[in-house]
């Protein structure tokens, strides 16, 4: 429970209605309490940190002035919504964020009426908010709709599709877009738009006028002259800053204003509430505001494990087991030294995809295209037409956003593009919007694609080299976190395409493991005396090995950390069916549902694709396999 002594006002806020009972003069103190509570809570639980600290004042102002949940707030991405959750009935549960059955890390409609739209991916807020505004207009509702979007998210194309639509509508929608400009996405924001927005807050002429006004007016911030000057300043900015872009698209532009100046923020929002038609308010904020260490390291404090706020993040001592991301990071630098045609593209995920070292060692061969997955894939296709060997480093969940380009621009033309797909399969605490549980299904159906899934770290390196050597589109899909700990070297050895690896020769049943499931499958197979195969390739499958095993085994079990529907197991069934082979099959994988937020271990166990789950499923289907087993093994099966 919240400490009422430390948080005398926040402890009285259970819903925004409670917030609106306070005097406006108390909002600054409430914001201070909210910021302190967020630091304390996330310090204990871990989670997204710096983004929420940057919107404390904005969150308080919005819930104070707008009649939520009747008026609707749509948050882009959702990294910044912990303060929103605290003010909307989840204050005492916020310490459970990202945990199984705890508070979701992103807005989730099933969780709260105040979470108006489920998010996790970037740049969707304006489209969703416009849809809500149109529906309200058609229903005769006078509700207001607000979209809050960061400058990093403004780099995605669908933002401008939505702005273009909203600005040209008749009748005009009752829509406010708030541009939360902190010069960041997860990594530093990049591109021409970011530079333009930077000029908005850094104009020398504008700053000189502002400072001169301060000297004349002194501390008299609320006298009529001061209020007139502030209004004049907001219009004057249009001569120096990006208002023209938004005005030309049909939006009335206000700003930029200090997003941490709560009285001024409240004043601007009050004015905007009286205006009709699409509005855009540009606020300047600092990611990590109020916690000095986060302000100084906005990337490092974007998302944190539990830590002591009085000390900050502390590096763990001892040798660190490399993650699959680390394996890719080392490989891409090694391959770049050997292959001068290699170029790397990432959509705003330099740190997450393991490209910090590469970006420093090969800056002229590194392309961060911002949050623009569609552009990233077609950019790679264009490079490939000119003989380059592009690598697209991308999370599985974000590749969904570039799927048309993968098919239309890369695969149809059989171009040499390698997709290094991180966070494949079960991802864990970030929930459904960040899961990689669909990729094997949507990749294996694409003609000309080679699709690989490594069982360990060494195999990941080999597959990346194989994909680089392959003449055509290839994908290496690897999981979040660490692998089993295979020995690594700096070689760039390749694998024969479409050839599986026999891990254990047994009898009766063959366990066919794909990717991260192979180790668990091997443990079960050795225990029960079954054949175990590391399939390696989802496409093409090792047809020769599968047909040979079908002659000598009574059944197949396929195991994958992907949805069963259309996945690797489906490919095995299709291959046998094409050869008119009838064989009992058991497909183990992820269910036909979206993953909730929980630990990776919990989710694998729930799906029955950890060691215990595989063993139980196999023995349930073929109970005769227990014949002759010891009681201890029988007990383990339960």
Swiss-Prot record:
The keyword Glycoprotein does not apply. Its cofactor is Mg(2+); thiamine diphosphate. It is an enzyme of class 2 (transferase). The keyword DNA-binding does not apply. Pathway: Metabolic intermediate biosynthesis; 1-deoxy-D-xylulose 5-phosphate biosynthesis; 1-deoxy-D-xylulose 5-phosphate from D-glyceraldehyde 3-phosphate and pyruvate: step 1/1. SUPFAM superfamilies: Thiamin diphosphate-binding fold (THDP-binding) (SSF52518), TK C-terminal domain-like (SSF52922). Its EC number is 2.2.1.7. Keywords: Isoprene biosynthesis, Magnesium, Metal-binding, Thiamine biosynthesis, Thiamine pyrophosphate, Transferase. Thiamine diphosphate binds at residues 79, 120-122, 152-153, 182, 291, 373. GO terms for molecular function: 1-deoxy-D-xylulose-5-phosphate synthase activity; magnesium ion binding; thiamine pyrophosphate binding. Binds 1 Mg(2+) ion per subunit. Binds 1 thiamine pyrophosphate per subunit. One of its GO terms (biological process) is thiamine biosynthetic process. SMART domains: Transket_pyr. Pfam families: DXP_synthase_N, Transket_pyr, Transketolase_C. One of its GO terms (cellular component) is cytosol. It catalyses: D-glyceraldehyde 3-phosphate + pyruvate + H(+) = 1-deoxy-D-xylulose 5-phosphate + CO2. Homodimer. PANTHER family: 1-D-DEOXYXYLULOSE 5-PHOSPHATE SYNTHASE-RELATED, 1-DEOXY-D-XYLULOSE-5-PHOSPHATE SYNTHASE, CHLOROPLASTIC. This is 1-deoxy-D-xylulose-5-phosphate synthase.
